[in-house]
């Protein structure tokens, strides 16, 4: 069966109403030794959005992850029981804990932490032992997100990545180290070890490529092309001065040209290593041809089975492999006579209690952390409740941050970015400096205090809402809604741009368009000086000593009855 015929059969299956999401996803409990059957002769492992988490962590999946229009009630916009039902996963087990927020505290206490590079390294070695020639790909957001990554300027993650055996990577938050530092790492550390690919990053003046667009690797005699797609909106979502002179973008036409080029040069398998975000990748897969798979990241979505997206040339698999080192995707292709005959995919949760740490990686991590032990372990406070970040509108750790900003900067209102990275703490856990830095470790940490009119406040909220809920995925930037403290509002995600935010109140009184309010914030994309967010939050936490159960304030969500991306 040739590739075109294989695609036709898949299309017929779709037309017949075949429920593709539930196919091939076996309960993880049946294979807790990670001994998954091998298929074919081309093997790709995929991780993404690790955010510099070298140690095992807790990470709660979202309770609110809204999909609208064509994304409504389909992956990745399924949460809780809806996700379990869609993929045929049983409640109460390891799979349910890994992929959903359900019974999170009890399940986390039962199954323990996830991820950690020493445990991940053991899993990678096991997969490679059963899959000769397997490649390890990283989708970006690898060098940022922890205290040690910030304090070492990313060097800790570069060294750990080489030890782990990453073959190819692309980027996003890597660029917030600054273009000079990125190029220094490529030249001094990655050269000859890790291919950094990004087809969509060009020189502003002349259009020359900044990075290699792709790499071709031969796996068991099969030429495999891996094209890189860095985050398209880096100079908008992050400080543009950090990548001065570089242009980004989705660049759909240029991607199609590159696919055609590598196909003409003999590539039998072509994949896109993407940091677009899931919805953007799904649209892209429907519009370009010749891609066998998009291995995606940025939106931190743990999708148990690839979406099979039809296009004019056949079908493209679209995956997204979660975040924080919590998952490892394994994609197998059976390639014969230059054609893909079959494929299989598993998204494996990395349970630290099931994977003994790799001694060499453990030794490296201990060496990395040793100079900073006292700072990392400094106890700032104790939390009585669950502290987490992920969710479209707020998380309890973000609520803690905006509360700290209001108190410490004497503000009326506080705004905090809708970052999707940031780990979870269980009730009773100490909040250490390391835990705090896992929420705020960025290279532009200044806090700000600004006077804003009510009209300006609404504009800011509307602008961020459009980045998330724009009906066209190509205009979405993939984060969550800006977190707010002190301010209450309602949101209608299906409304037109500029008309989604309503009912803004402060202390029970309507926010007035012409009245001025003191608004605290942090992470300005312009070059602004201010006290670092971690210093502000650390001081506040020390003054509180004990953080009582945090109620993460949520807006009133209108017009989304029956949306499976919202769980009560």
List where the protein language model places each region:
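Short coil/turn linker and secondary-structure boundary residues
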Residues: 1, 115, 246, 356, ...
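Hard-cation-handling environments
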Residues: 359-431
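Charged, low-complexity surface segments at secondary-structure and domain boundaries
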Residues: 346-355, 384-390, 442-449, 523-526
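Feature captures C-terminal
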Residues: 32-43, 47-69, 193-199, 205, ...
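Short, solvent-exposed loop/turn motifs
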Residues: 223, 386-387, 488, 510
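Acidic, metal/ion-coordinating pockets
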Residues: 2-12, 17-351, 360, 392-404, ...
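Residue-level signal for pocket-adjacent positions within structured domains
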Residues: 212, 241-243, 313, 345-346, ...
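Alpha-helix initiation and N-capping motif
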Residues: 117, 179, 358-365, 369, ...
């Amino acid at each position: 069966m040739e590739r075109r015929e294989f695609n036709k059969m898949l299309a017929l299956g779709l037309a017949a109403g075949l429920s593709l999401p539930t196919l091939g996803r076996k309960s993880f409990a049946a294979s807790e030794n990670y001994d998954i059957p091998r298929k074919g002769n081309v093997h790709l492992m995929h991780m993404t959005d690790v955010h510099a988490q070298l140690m095992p962590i807790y990470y709660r999946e979202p309770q609110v992850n809204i999909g609208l229009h064509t994304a409504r009630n389909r992956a990745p916009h399924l949460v809780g029981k809806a996700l379990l039902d869609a993929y045929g996963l049983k409640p109460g087990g390891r799979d349910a804990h890994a992929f959903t927020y359900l019974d999170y505290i009890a399940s986390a206490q039962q199954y323990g932490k996830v991820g950690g590079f020493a445990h991940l390294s053991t899993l990678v070695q096991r997969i490679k032992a059963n899959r000769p020639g397997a490649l390890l790909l990283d989708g970006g957001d690898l060098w940022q997100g922890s205290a040690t990554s910030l304090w070492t300027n990313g060097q800790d993650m570069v060294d750990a990545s080489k030890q782990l055996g990453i073959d190819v990577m692309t980027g996003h938050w890597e660029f917030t180290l600054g273009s000079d530092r990125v190029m220094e790492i490529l030249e001094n550390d990655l050269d000859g070890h890790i291919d950094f690919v990004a087809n969509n990053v060009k020189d502003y003046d002349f259009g020359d490529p900044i990075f290699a667009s792709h790499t071709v690797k031969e796996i068991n005699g099969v030429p495999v092309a891996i094209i890189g797609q860095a985050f398209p909106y880096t100079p908008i979502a992050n400080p543009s001065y950090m990548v001065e002179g570089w242009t980004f973008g989705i660049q759909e036409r240029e991607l199609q040209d590159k696919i055609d080029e590598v196909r003409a040069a003999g590539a039998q398998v072509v994949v896109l290593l993407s940091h677009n975000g899931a919805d953007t990748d799904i649209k892209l897969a429907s519009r370009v041809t010749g891609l066998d798979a998009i291995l995606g990241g940025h939106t931190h979505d743990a999708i148990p089975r690839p979406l099979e997206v039809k296009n004019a040339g056949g079908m493209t698999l679209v995956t997204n492999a979660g975040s924080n080192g919590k998952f490892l995707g394994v994609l197998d292709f059976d390639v014969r006579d230059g054609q893909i005959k079959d494929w299989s995919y598993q998204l494996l949760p990395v349970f630290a209690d099931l994977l003994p740490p790799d001694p060499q990686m453990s030794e490296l991590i201990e060496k990395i952390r040793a100079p900073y032990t006292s700072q990392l372990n400094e106890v700032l406070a104790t939390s009585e409740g669950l502290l987490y970040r992920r969710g479209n509108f707020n998380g309890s750790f973000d609520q803690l941050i905006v509360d700290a900003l209001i108190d410490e900067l004497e503000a009326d209102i506080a705004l905090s970015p809708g970052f999707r990275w940031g780990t979870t703490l269980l009730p009773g856990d100490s909040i250490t400096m390391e835990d705090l830095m896992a929420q705020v470790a960025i290279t532009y940490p200044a806090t700000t205090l600004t006077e804003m009119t009510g009209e300006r406040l609404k504009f800011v909220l509307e602008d961020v809402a459009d980045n998330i809920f724009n009906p066209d995925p190509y205009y979405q930037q993939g984060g969550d809604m800006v977190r707010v403290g002190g301010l209450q509002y309602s949101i209608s995600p299906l409304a037109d741009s500029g008309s989604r935010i309503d009912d803004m109140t402060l202390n029970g009184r309507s926010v007035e368009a012409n009245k001025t309010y003191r608004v605290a914030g942090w992470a300005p994309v312009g070059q602004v000086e201010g006290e670092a967010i971690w210093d502000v939050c650390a001081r506040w936490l020390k003054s509180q000593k004990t953080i009582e159960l945090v109620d993460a304030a949520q807006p009133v969500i209108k017009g989304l009855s029956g949306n499976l991306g919202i769980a009560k």
